[in-house]
């Protein structure tokens, strides 16, 4: 098993909010100022015919690639992406998942929150600093475009001359996703219909955009399966992990799934978990990991098994009915042929409903030595109840009985320009009734839509208690992974049932809670997080399951908007902001 260095390393933020505003506002290049490099990309987003799982379909790609191109930079670098929308009939934005966007909240890539959607034929330029090493990704954030295939990897290395607190010889990058044969537009219409038409389970699991439908590369172990006949040159041919014996590999794993929670395992190999969501964790050994939509991990493996054999890599579905075959590929010990199948069948995915196993993995994640510690006390605490509801017969998801419906004018611009009629100025409820029974369906399933904002004072320490509950049908509660834009947060703890402060306060971990940007709520349970509202902007906080967000499962946070500097004009060209003349672009 790989060794991990004792010395922690945590890169400091590269630029302050003010310096970023000055640089971007006045067009000073970083090379002129003596700062780190600029990574410049020109992307065209368009629909393409593709065969992700050996069945031809339409995907949303970038520059003719699916998944999109990988961005690779060092912490402190500036990333510039000129994004041209070639979709013809719909807008587009891209969210840089896990990037904090300090000083550039307009570049967060959230339609109706940080910017206007980019119209067909138009180009929008994203500029932002990647300020912290880690494993990240990017994806569409308008409608359900992530489910259509608009995603790619974003890898940030330490600043030049710095090293990570662990050693490895080489690395492999894996982007996991789920795939449907039904178009995203049909899915969206079905979710918005009365009665609601559910999207169903995915047809395939993709590994770096590659999967197999209606056949298996492991059919020889199961006579009921059809063997895939592949030459290796097809778009759906497995992405093989080629390795040399007696080396240590860092495998970066990110999940951009629209629905599925996944389990990752490699036959005969242990995994040493060292990073989660761009933050170092106390290393621990496990046979497999559960990874929820929006999460990322780095694991180290040592190729110390029989070098004459190859080994299975298996990605199975967890927390949902097992109707989707596992995604499979090979850990290919060179110089063995990649066509040589392992002697044993693929690792078996744990039972889909074994939440105790999921919790045992999640509860082992702690911050690495030297990580920032949370403030001891909070200034404000929100209790967010997650329920399934209806509005006039339409099925919705709601938080504290409000289903999020985004306004046509982006919050960031509306608040900066003080357009008080652009959205509801009354904030949503900060808690829910103490006597609410989370173990039964809502007594009053009717809910309302809303677009109010939770506003925080700059520097305020905020606790959020995410509370899960029963759905509309009895005895049903689902896992929900929640992602916060613009911040990392400390995961203080998890619990069963309804959060009860006098008792559950004692369970919160203030010593070494992990920093994350995505966290799971287990069925009928609660999750407590803490963050500091120190990043001027407007930020989404939402379930990372695409259909759930589409149906209203999210809220919006705002802090320090008066401190936000220049907002590019193209981010303002919609809704009420498009009518404002002579808006001062600089503070």
Curated annotation (Swiss-Prot):
Protein residues bound to Cu cation 3: 141, 485, 542
Q: Where is the signal peptide?
A: 1-33
Q: Glycosylated at which positions?
A: 360, 401, 475
Tell me the disulfide pairings in this chain.
54-236, 116-574, 215-228
Q: What is its EC number?
A: 1.10.3.3
Write one Pfam family the protein is assigned to.
Answer: Cu-oxidase_2
Q: Where does Cu cation 4 bind?
A: 480, 543, 548, 553
* Spans traversing the lipid bilayer: none
Q: What is its main location?
A: secreted
Reactions listed under catalytic activity? 4 L-ascorbate + O2 = 4 monodehydro-L-ascorbate radical + 2 H2O
Amino acids binding Cu cation 1? 95, 483
Q: Where in the cell is it found?
A: Secreted
Plastocyanin-like domain location, by residue?
38-157, 169-335, 379-559
The enzyme's main class, written as a single word, is: oxidoreductase
> To which protein family does this belong?
Belongs to the multicopper oxidase family.
Q: What is this protein for, i.e. what is its function?
A: May be involved in a redox system involving ascorbic acid.
Query: This protein is called what?
Result: L-ascorbate oxidase
Lineage, broadest ranks: Eukaryota, Viridiplantae, Streptophyta, Embryophyta, Tracheophyta
């Amino acid at each position: 098993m790989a060794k991990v260095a004792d010395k922690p390393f945590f890169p400091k933020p590269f630029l302050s909010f003010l310096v970023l505003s000055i640089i971007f506002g006045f067009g000073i290049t970083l090379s002129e100022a003596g700062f780190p490099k600029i990574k410049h990309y020109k992307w065209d987003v368009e629909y393409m015919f593709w065969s992700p799982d050996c069945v031809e379909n339409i995907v949303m790609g970038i520059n003719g690639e699916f998944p999109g191109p990988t961005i690779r930079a060092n912490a402190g670098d500036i990333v510039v992406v000129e994004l041209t929308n070639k979709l013809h009939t719909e807008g587009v934005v891209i969210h840089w998942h896990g990037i904090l966007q300090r000083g550039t909240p307009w570049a967060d890539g959230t339609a109706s929150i940080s910017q206007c959607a980019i119209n067909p034929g138009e180009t929008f330029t994203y500029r932002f600093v990647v300020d912290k090493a880690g494993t990240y990704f990017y994806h569409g954030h308008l409608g359900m475009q992530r489910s259509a295939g608009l995603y790619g990897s974003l890898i940030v290395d330490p600043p030049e001359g710095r090293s990570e607190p662990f050693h490895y010889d080489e690395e492999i990058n894996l982007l996991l996703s789920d795939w449907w044969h039904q178009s995203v537009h049909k899915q969206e219409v079905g979710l918005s219909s009365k009665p609601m038409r559910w999207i169903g389970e995915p047809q395939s699991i993709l590994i770096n955009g590659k999967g197999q439908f209606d056949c298996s590369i492991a059919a020889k172990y199961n006579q009921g399966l059809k063997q895939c006949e592949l030459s290796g040159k097809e778009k759906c041919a497995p992405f093989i992990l080629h390795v040399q014996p007696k080396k240590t590999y860092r495998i970066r794993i990110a999940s951009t799934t629209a629905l599925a929670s996944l389990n990752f395992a490699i036959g005969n190999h242990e995994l040493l978990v060292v990073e989660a969501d761009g933050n170092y964790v106390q290393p621990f050994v496990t046979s497999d990991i559960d990874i929820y939509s929006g999460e990322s991990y780095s694991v180290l493996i040592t190729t110390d098994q029989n070098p004459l054999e190859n080994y299975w890599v298996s990605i199975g579905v967890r927390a949902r009915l097992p109707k989707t075959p596992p995604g499979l590929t090979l850990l290919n010990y060179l110089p063995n042929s990649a066509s040589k199948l392992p002697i044993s069948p693929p690792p078996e995915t744990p039972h889909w409903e074994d939440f105790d196993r999921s919790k045992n993995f999640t509860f082992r994640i702690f911050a690495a030595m030297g990580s920032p510690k949370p403030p001891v006390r909070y200034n404000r605490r929100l209790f967010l109840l997650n329920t399934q509801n209806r509005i006039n017969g339409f099925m919705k998801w709601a938080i504290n009985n409000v289903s999020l419906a985004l306004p046509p004018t982006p919050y960031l611009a509306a608040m900066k320009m003080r357009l008080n009629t652009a959205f509801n100025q009354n904030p949503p409820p900060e808690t829910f009734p103490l006597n609410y029974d989370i173990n039964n369906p809502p007594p009053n399933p009717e809910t309302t839509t809303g677009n109010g904002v939770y506003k925080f004072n700059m520097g305020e320490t905020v606790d959020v208690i995410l509370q899960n509950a029963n759905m509309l049908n009895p005895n049903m509660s689902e896992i929900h992974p929640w992602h916060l834009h613009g911040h990392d947060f400390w995961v203080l703890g998890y619990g069963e049932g309804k959060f009860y402060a006098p008792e559950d306060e004692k369970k919160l971990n203030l010593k070494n809670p992990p920093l994350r940007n995505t966290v799971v709520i287990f069925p009928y349970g609660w999750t407590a997080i803490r963050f500091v509202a120190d990043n001027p902007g407007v930020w989404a906080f939402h379930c990372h399951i695409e259909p759930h967000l589409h149906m209203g499962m999210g809220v919006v946070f705002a802090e320090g908007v008066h401190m936000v500097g220049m907002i590019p004009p193209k981010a303002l060209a919609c809704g009420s902001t498009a009518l404002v003349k002579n808006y001062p672009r600089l503070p």
